[in-house]
Amino acid sequence: TIVEMDSTWEVAMAKRLDKLKIRWDRDESIKIHYQNEKGKNKNYIPDFYLPEFKLFIEVKGYWTDAARYKMKDVQERYPNSFLILESLEEISKVNRRLLAKTKKYQT
C-alpha cells in the first residue's frame, strides 16, 4: 500500500514506527473536532494514529499561530490522546515518549 505523506518529517516518523514494529494508520476519515481562534468549529486530520496505544501523533516542524492555537485546543479536549513531536530528535526517540505517555495514563 502506498501512503502519501505531507513532509519529510512524516516520512521519518513512519520509518521509525516501522522499525519499532509499531502499527500505525494514516486515515483521512479520522477527524478530530476543535475550535479555531475565532471560535469556529473545525475538523483536523492527525498525521498518525497508533491503535495499540490509542494515541494520535502530530509531527510539527513549522508552527503558525493558527497551528499553535489548534493544537492547544485539541490537547485540552483530548488530553491523553495526543503526542506532538517537534524535531527529528524527538522522532528518533519516539519509543521513549510513547512508553512515558502510556505509563503516565495507565489505570
Listing of model-derived features with the role each one plays in the protein:
Residues 1-107:
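Electrostatic, structured charged patches in enzyme active sites and in nucleic-acid/phosphate-binding
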